[in-house]
Regions:
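Acidic, low-complexity intrinsically disordered tails
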Residues: 4-6, 10-20, 599-685, 689, ...
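ASCE RecA-like P-loop NTPase motor cores
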Residues: 15-611, 615-618
């Protein structure tokens, strides 16, 4: 029986160590500008060109071109996207194109993250608080495991999260357990290896990253894949290795060998831990003495108490809160050295593709500065050792050195990409489908909403979708509320909407649950929505970041995948950016029309199947999705977050006593347990929004209120 017949396809990635070639699976062949673009890019990579730029219009098949380049150069590849939503879309597409190869997804695993901070002006310290998405954590582990498995056919789709520090790849690799049937190893020795790989023991139902022992049988729930293993011992010998269903525990088959990768990216050896603790204590003594020499007794005492407590926690349980601030010691790095990151897990000859580079590159540049300003305060006021500054994202020049060969992909490349490519710019302006760029019309802003609703109604009657882009998140939410009252099936997405919720909303738009999607800058780059025939740009004449030539061109491109594509710019004057966008769009329309005429092509709509994104299956039924729309529409995931959050303004952090709070909010005294739970949930949503808006004092206040209410919940009777 074939190996792939025994176990799920995804598991095959992790115990096959054979070097495989990329196998592109597509019913289409490159056409239009694609063959020429693919050849030029492949030749550039083979000739060692450090940077190239693919200038491809929306709908010209840039993703398919990228896939063909990857298949031909046959190297491990990092595809970098500037937000999680587009990264998820690319991940889904590459999983389809390369079903037999290892395609991985690596983004930030925080659903909510409030960083540690100190505000000197008000003498307020805010402790770190976070919520981790377990599914994304699993996908991150799967990424590092695949890269260290020895396979060459690995594609990683990532956000800028790949710039942040993770564990030393040498330590991670040393903690991999390479098990073979017949190995001479005692059960207890094997259990110690699991603990060193950060798996934890349980006697209950297996959760991810746990193991259970019954006699000579050890069951393990892998941390990086939805699979369980059963290792059976006969004395001091491994008798059998089975892959099991993680819940039902039925067998997928037996295996002669299996590699078990660590349960956490931040893994280290006991020897390195002891060395790190010793160095932390040395630096602590030196920095405390420096504070005292400067007459800063408060800072000296604060630093001594905090670090001493952390050291004791590390000695006793192996970790502490904020252990990432000591990563330099555990990694064995010198002061000032860059942290290890995902790029260190790739082989030396990997290829980097930066999607929507005109946005992604500036984002990469900005990562280091924002992190440094926050850490500097923590160090200066005795909350952290100097080493905390070295727990940081990569600087831009460090990123450039770690990515020897890069392809920038954008419909509107910026000056940096063009200059670094030194004239190696590959144009892809022909759409194989024959689709033309959308028509652009300019409409006065007076009565723009009434006019827009009429246009939406026309598209809805044809079964088409509409995108509306506003200047602010608040405008998006208020317009969403108004459309809901007008019985328009609508939703919105922006930075306050959780990653998985964004993906669901986009899928629901394609499915017909919504007819309209409202957003801000998330509607500009890369969204692949062939059902969208109308893009409405409100306040198009308000010059700025969201209404410059590049942004407008990208927004116009969202309607370029539909046969009836049209863009309406609502404005009272035509700005220079608007005119450039209109002229460039018209130029591309003429090129496409000439190509269609020469090749006798009739434009045809893109038919793109809805598929699973990041483990979530797309619905296939038609009618039930429409039936569920009204209830879902009234409270989309982020709407209640923002409504709740807007009720609070930033204020100084206080820690009121329970009695003070009861006087301030007497309604709580009359709540039953169910009502209190709902109130706590609303506060939690407000806390998440406050943290995302960098209002850390407000988020900390809400966090403490939630803790107090949870403690008092038990005393409230029904």
């Amino acid at each position: 029986m074939l190996l792939t017949q025994i176990v799920p396809r995804s598991l095959f990635d992790f115990y096959t160590t054979s070097i495989m070639d990329f196998k592109l699976d597509s019913q289409y062949a490159p056409t239009g500008d694609q063959p020429q673009a693919i050849d030029q890019l492949v030749h550039g990579v083979d000739d060692g060109a450090p940077a190239q730029t693919l200038l491809g219009v929306t709908g010209s098949g840039k993703t398919f071109t990228m896939a063909n380049v990857i298949a031909r150069v046959n190297r491990p590849t990092l595809i970098l996207s500037h937000n999680k939503t587009l990264a998820a879309q690319l991940y889904s597409e590459f999983k389809q194109i390369f079903p037999e190869n290892s395609v991985q997804y690596f983004v930030s695993y925080y659903d909510y993250y409030q960083p540690e901070a100190y505000i000197p002006s008000s003498d307020k310290y805010i402790e770190k608080d976070l919520m981790i998405n377990e599914e994304i954590d699993r996908l991150r582990l799967a990424t590092t495991s695949a890269l260290l498995s020895g396979r060459r056919d690995v594609i990683v789709v990532s956000s800028v999260s790949c710039l942040y520090g993770i564990g030393n790849p040498e330590d991670f690799n040393e903690s991999v357990i390479d098990l073979h049937v017949g190995d001479r190893i005692s059960r207890n020795e094997f259990l110690r290896s699991l603990v060193n790989a950060l798996y934890s023991r349980t006697e209950l139902a297996l959760e991810r990253g746990q193991f259970r022992v019954k006699g000579d049988t050890v069951d393990i729930r892998l941390a990086y894949e939805d699979i369980a293993l059963r290792i059976t011992f006969w004395g001091d010998e491994v008798e059998s290795i089975q892959a099991l269903h993680p819940i039902e525990m039925y067998s997928f088959g037996k295996h002669d060998s299996f590699k078990i990768y660590p349960a956490n990216i931040f893994v280290t050896s006991p020897l390195r831990q002891a060395s790190a603790v010793a160095q932390i204590q040395l630096d602590l003594g030196r920095e405390v003495e420096n504070f005292r020499n400067e007459g800063k007794e408060l800072e000296a005492q604060r630093l001594y108490e905090r670090v001493t407590y952390d050291v004791e926690m590390i000695k006793e349980v192996g970790h502490c809160s904020g252990i990432e601030n000591y990563s330099r010691y555990f990694d064995g790095r010198e002061p000032g050295m860059r942290p290890f990151c995902l790029l260190d897990y790739f082989p030396d000859d990997f290829l980097t593709i930066i999607d929507e580079s005109h946005v992604t590159v500036p984002q990469i540049r900005a990562m280091y500065g924002g992190d440094l300003s926050r850490k500097t305060n923590l160090v200066q006021y005795g909350f952290r050792l100097q080493a905390a500054v070295d727990n940081r994202p990569l600087k831009f020049d460090e990123f450039e050195r770690l990515t020897p060969q890069t392809i920038y992909v954008s419909a509107t490349p910026a000056d940096y990409e063009l200059s670094r490519s030194e004239g190696i710019v590959v144009e892809q302006v022909i759409r194989p489908t024959g689709l033309l760029d959308p028509k652009i019309t300019v409409h006065p802003s007076e009565n723009q909403i009434d006019h827009l609703m009429e246009e939406i109604q026309l598209r809805t009657e044809r079964g088409e979708r509409t995108l509306v882009t506003t200047l602010t998140k608040r405008m998006a939410e208020e317009l969403n509320d108004y459309f809901c009252r007008m019985d328009i099936r609508t939703a919105y997405i922006h930075s306050d909407v959780d990653t998985m919720d964004r993906i669901r909303i986009l899928d629901d738009l394609r499915a017909g649950v919504y007819d309209v999607l409202i957003g801000v800058n998330l509607l500009r780059e890369g969204l692949d929505l062939p059902e969208v025939s109308l893009v409405a740009i409100l306040d198009a004449d308000k010059e700025g970041f969201l209404r410059n030539h590049r942004s407008l061109t990208q927004t116009v491109g969202r309607a370029a995948r539909n046969l009836n594509g049209e863009v309406i710019m609502y404005a009272d004057r035509i700005t220079e950016s608007m005119q450039r966008t209109i002229d460039e769009t018209e130029r591309r329309r003429k090129i496409q029309m000439q190509y269609n005429k020469e090749h006798n092509i009739t434009p045809k709509a893109i038919v793109k199947p809805r598929t699973s994104i990041v483990g979530m299956d797309a619905e296939t039924a038609d009618v039930p999705q429409f039936e569920a729309a009204p209830a879902y529409r009234q409270q989309p995931a982020a709407a209640k977050d923002r409504r709740g959050k807007q009720q609070h303004q930033p204020r100084a952090y206080v820690d009121p006593s329970p009695s003070q709070q009861q006087v301030a909010d007497p309604v709580l005294a009359f709540m039953n347990r169910e009502q209190l739970k709902k109130h706590i949930e609303r506060l939690r949503e407000q806390m998440i929004c406050a943290a995302k808006d960098m209002e850390f004092i407000e988020a900390a206040r809400l966090r403490d209120e939630i803790i107090r209410l949870e403690l008092s919940e038990q005393s409230i009777t029904e």
